[in-house]
């Protein structure tokens, strides 16, 4: 009996094995098969509409209409290979996404390649880059004739559609533009340029900058009152000891008076730096005073806080770092009336780890040393990045709307320890403005 059962078991396994082997010979009528012959493209439309097109932006999905499209095994837009999904290919339709990389060499054609690369069919089609993204400018307060760089993406300078950069009142001569790939372009501020947004026009269309040239919105400190900001701070170190007028230093002013932190060698750590006289300024408010009250009570600042919230705002200022900066960070500390006022004077907030602050220390990302090569630059820090303790580690606190009544800058401590240095850091036109 056992022998019979063994034979039955063996026979069952054999049948299973034979059945498995024979599945290779089964015919699946719905399986995708590459067709022979040559594809024919009659038209192209968007994947989700009946609009017929002759061009599309990178990463858009399009639908090729024609005959024998299952013969296509490769599809290229210019010199960029597209990804084919056979689930979206029939004899008469082919859905495909335009590659997200801009071609190195434009031919304005689609190439449809058949099995074994036997044949290549060409079809006229233009790939457009997205609209230019005009993100930032090296110096928003540059003078006419001064060289600046704008940063962003998709600054595609095509011979058939050259880039046009426009300031209010003046365009940049194309011959003055120097491109570094498609992410930045350098030029001189043209004669006649007026304050306002900068626009960049490419073959894809026109985009407006996220910044403003000579941005005078909500300037909190301009150090001479010429832009509606405070001409001096308020507190034990109100800025008078670091206040400068044009001609005070061997480098040029950018917009009248400014402040400059200098004259002190700073070493690593918290205890080897503290010099409020030479390396800081305070603004401690006098609540209710129409001239010396809370910063956040200034009408323009109050409106921006209401409209954009903390997450939609950034602090900006112009800076010139004239000597190598290799150590400590610039602490940017907004304070509330509970932290400090003119009546309740104290500097304890500098070391208070529960007060979240921003820290600017560009020498860290620059490889250990930073200067601006004698030029002014624009510094931008989102208020959402005011989330650090004095040593740069993450704070348990976050910046809130009621924490914007006072402001202090102090060159002290920071996230990293570098080498001793005697930095010279000039600052002007401190402002809080929308991010975009």
Where on the chain are the PLM-derived regions?
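Extracellular beta-strand ligand-recognition surfaces/modules
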Residues: 313-317, 329-332, 378-424, 430
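A structural motif
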Residues: 62-64, 75, 94-96, 108-113, ...
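C-terminal motif of bacterial Sec signal peptides marking the signal peptidase cleavage site
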Residues: 16-20
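Short, aromatic- and glycine-rich surface loops/edge beta-strands on solvent-exposed regions
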Residues: 104-116, 193-203, 408-409
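Beta-strand/beta-sandwich contexts
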Residues: 22-70, 117-160, 195, 204-229
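Extracellular ligand-binding interfaces
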Residues: 291, 295, 308-310, 314-392
């Amino acid at each position: 009996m056992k022998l019979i059962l063994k034979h039955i078991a063996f026979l069952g396994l054999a049948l299973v094995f034979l059945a498995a082997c024979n599945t290779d010979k089964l015919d699946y009528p719905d399986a995708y098969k590459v067709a022979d012959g040559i594809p024919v493209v009659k038209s192209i439309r968007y994947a989700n509409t009946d609009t017929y097109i002759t061009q599309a932006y990178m990463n858009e999905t399009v639908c090729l209409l024609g005959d024998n499209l299952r013969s296509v095994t490769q599809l290229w837009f210019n010199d960029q290979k597209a990804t084919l999904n056979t689930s979206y290919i029939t004899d008469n339709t082919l859905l495909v996404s335009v590659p997200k990389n801009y071609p190195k060499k434009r031919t304005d054609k689609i190439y449809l390649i058949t099995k074994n690369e036997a044949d290549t069919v060409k079809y006229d089609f233009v790939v457009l880059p997205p609209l230019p993204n005009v993100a930032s400018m090296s110096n928003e307060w540059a003078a006419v004739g001064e060289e600046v760089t704008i940063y962003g993406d998709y600054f595609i300078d095509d011979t058939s559609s050259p880039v046009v950069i426009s300031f209010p009142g003046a365009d940049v001569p194309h011959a003055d533009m120097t491109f570094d790939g498609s992410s930045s372009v350098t030029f001189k501020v043209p004669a006649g340029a007026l304050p306002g947004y900068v626009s960049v026009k490419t073959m894809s269309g026109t985009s407006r900058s996220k910044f403003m040239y000579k941005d005078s919105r909500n300037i909190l400190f301009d150090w001479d009152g010429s832009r509606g900001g405070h001409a001096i701070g308020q507190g034990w170190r109100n800025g008078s000891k670091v206040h400068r007028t044009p001609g005070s230093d061997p480098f040029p002013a950018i917009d009248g008076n400014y402040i400059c932190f200098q004259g002190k060698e700073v070493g690593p750590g918290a205890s080897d730096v503290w010099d409020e006289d030479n390396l800081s300024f305070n603004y401690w408010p006098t609540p209710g005073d129409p001239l010396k009250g809370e910063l956040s009570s200034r009408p323009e600042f109050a409106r921006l806080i209401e409209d954009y919230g903390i997450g939609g705002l950034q602090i900006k200022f112009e800076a010139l770092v004239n000597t190598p900066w290799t150590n400590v960070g610039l602490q940017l500390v907004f304070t509330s009336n509970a932290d400090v006022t003119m009546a309740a004077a104290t500097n304890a907030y500098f070391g208070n780890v529960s007060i979240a602050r921003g820290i600017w220390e560009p020498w860290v990302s620059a490889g250990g040393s930073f200067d601006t090569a004698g030029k002014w630059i624009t510094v931008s820090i989102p208020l959402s990045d005011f989330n650090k303790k004095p040593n740069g580690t993450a704070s348990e606190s976050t910046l809130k709307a009621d924490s914007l009544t006072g402001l202090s800058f102090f060159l002290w401590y920071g996230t990293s320890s570098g080498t001793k240095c005697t930095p010279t850091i000039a600052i002007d036109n401190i402002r809080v403005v929308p991010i975009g």
